[in-house]
From Swiss-Prot:
Key words, A-Z: Disease variant, Disulfide bond, FAD, Flavoprotein, Mitochondrion, NADP, Oxidoreductase, Redox-active center, Selenocysteine, Transit peptide
Further remarks about this protein from its record: The active site is a redox-active disulfide bond. The selenocysteine residue is essential for enzymatic activity.
Molecular functions (GO terms): flavin adenine dinucleotide binding; protein homodimerization activity; protein-containing complex binding; thioredoxin-disulfide reductase (NADPH) activity
Statement: the UniProt record of this protein carries the keyword Lipoprotein: no
Organism name: Homo sapiens
Protein name, as recorded: Thioredoxin reductase 2, mitochondrial
S-S bonds: 86-91
Function as written in the Swiss-Prot or TrEMBL entry: Involved in the control of reactive oxygen species levels and the regulation of mitochondrial redox homeostasis. Maintains thioredoxin in a reduced state. May play a role in redox-regulated cell signaling.
Location in chain, cross-link Cysteinyl-selenocysteine (Cys-Sec): 522-523
Length: 524
């Protein structure tokens, strides 16, 4: 074993030293790296949205690039292609199934608009799933083609570090592959967490890794968790007509504005999703007829209860996909609590030439556009002469529940905690989308609020919108908030009529005033 002193920059900007033992006998990998004979300028570990963005950006800057990516099958055996969580088991299939559910609602509205629709209108899970899966596969292929066009070498191998410049993997034929690079970016993302302490959870439960690839309808489904993944999955399952229950132990949508979160739950409950609040499962068993019997405890009563379901979906959070990387061989530090990789503002790990982006990183929002932008900016700093850093403030996002919740900036709770109640002004309104009127839809939970500093010019701290097309509404206002918009500037913005978006530029009533925020009338 040869000893090598490696200078490591700490997260606080200080330097510290570590003596790292490197195995010089691993087929000369370490010796080759030390001799400046590395295979690539950049090696990206992980073929998700962030990793692919890094690879394509570096190739465009004329660098020699390789991507290694491998999908460990889920406990239920589900596997997929290149593209990561977003493409295969996240944003894309989720939004498409959300759209399927919205169409079901529009079919119910259609008779009020003069369409003669024979009822009931059945939903075909197999047809929807096949269409969604075919689209995802086309995206997998598209990513392969894009890498090939940019002369990025792609390796479908499970990589692990040999030393700080080298990774090792085994190809399908059993051949061992060693790859070295001057710079390495880790972008392996995360995977759903399984409650392994619960009897039967691993054997009989599925996660978001599986739901979008089911060939048959999941039937009566229990979704366990209060995350946005739990609510989104339960929302589209209810929307396509399935009997769906959410079991949550604590508050929903932790980290989001809690007033908005409560309204999301109210809307889902009023539209058919059942909720078991303050409950935690303790056992899952398969019955002779194939159904799953779930046992849980109600924390409010202390009593045990049971129910039967066709499918149990765990949506209790995600864990970083770092377990098989052998990060200790490279000297990369991780959080002892979360196992996520620790980085500084430049996305650099404890090893100067190893970086990490996306969901695998401690303290970063787990959002696809974040990983993509952070990756591109990182590569531009490495190879393009840029000094621009990723700005993680005021990042917009949307929860695609049946009534969508879009937000950007601070929640009301965060604003009050940061600035004090006396320095925060909240403008709000209950509104009714025009499309809901003729259809006779309930708009009780259609709501918008803007969180501002109270002192002039009343800087906008956050915007929260609950209603149709919330993502489309929030995206435009996110630019204004990013640029430092004030409440007065928003109020001087002319709205587009008739739209839901215009409700944002009509917010005149503050919570402090105590006046009724319900919007009445139209065109005025």
């Amino acid at each position: 074993m040869a000893a090598m002193a490696v200078a490591l920059r700490g997260l606080g900007g200080r330097f510290r030293w570590r003596t790292q033992a490197v195995a010089g006998g691993v087929r000369g990998a370490a010796r080759g790296a030390a001799a400046g004979q590395r295979d690539y300028d950049l090696l990206v570990v992980g073929g998700g949205s962030g990793g692919l963005a890094c690879a394509k950006e570096a190739a465009q800057l004329g660098r020699k690039v390789a991507v290694v990516d491998y999908v460990e099958p889920s406990p239920q055996g589900t596997r997929w292609g290149l593209g990561g969580t977003c493409v295969n088991v996240g944003c894309i299939p989720k939004k498409l199934m959300h759209q399927a559910a919205l169409l079901g609602g529009l079919i119910q509205d259609a008779p009020n608009y003069g369409w003669e629709v024979a009822q009931p209108v059945p939903h075909d899970w197999r047809k929807m799933a096949e269409a969604v899966q075919n689209h995802v596969k086309s995206l997998n292929w598209g990513h392969r083609v894009q890498l090939q066009d940019r002369k990025v070498k792609y390796f479908n191998i499970k990589a692990s570090f040999v030393d700080e410049h080298t990774v090792c993997g085994v190809a399908k034929g059993g051949k061992e592959i060693l790859l070295s690079a001057d710079h390495i970016i880790i972008a392996t993302g995360g995977r759903p967490r399984y409650p392994t302490h619960i009897e039967g959870a691993l054997e009989y439960g599925i996660t978001s890794d599986d739901i979008f690839w089911l060939k048959e309808s999941p039937g009566k489904t229990l979704v366990v968790g209060a995350s946005y993944v739990a609510l989104e999955c339960a929302g589209f399952l209810t929307g396509i007509g399935l009997d769906t229950t959410i079991m949550m132990r604590s508050i929903p949508l932790r980290g989001f504005d809690q007033q908005m979160s409560s309204m999301v739950i109210e809307h889902m409950a009023s539209h058919g999703t059942r909720f078991l609040r303050g409950c935690a499962p303790s056992r899952v068993r398969r019955l002779p007829d194939g159904q799953l019997q779930v046992t849980w405890e109600d924390s409010t009563t202390g009593k045990e209860d049971t129910g039967t379901f066709d499918t149990v979906l765990w949506a209790i959070g995600r864990v970083p996909d770092t377990r098989s990387l052998n990060l200790e061989k490279a000297g990369v530090d991780t959080s002892p609590d979360t196992q996520k990789i620790l980085v500084d503002s430049r996305e650099a790990t404890s090893v100067p030439h190893i970086y990490a982006i996306g969901d695998v990183v401690e303290g970063r929002p787990e959002l696809t556009p974040i990983a993509i932008m952070a990756g591109r900016l990182l590569v531009q700093r490495l190879f393009g002469g840029s000094s621009d850093l990723m700005d993680y403030d005021n990042v917009p996002t949307t929860v695609f529940t049946p009534l969508e919740y879009g937000c950007v900036g601070l929640s009301e709770e965060e604003a009050v905690a940061r600035h004090g109640q006396e320095h925060v002004e909240v403008y709000h309104a209950h509104y009714k989308p025009l499309e809901f009127t003729v259809a006779g839809r309930d708009a009780s939970q259609c709501y918008v609020k803007m969180v501002c500093l109270r002192e002039p010019p009343q800087l906008v701290l956050g915007l929260h919108f609950l209603g149709p097309n919330a993502g489309e509404v929030t995206q435009g206002f996110a630019l204004g908030i990013k640029c430092g918009a004030s409440y007065a500037q928003v109020m001087r913005t002319v709205g587009i009529h008739p739209t839901c978006s215009e409700e944002v530029v009509k917010l005149r009533i503050s919570k402090r005033s105590g006046l009724d925020p319900t919007v009445t009338g139209c065109u005025g």
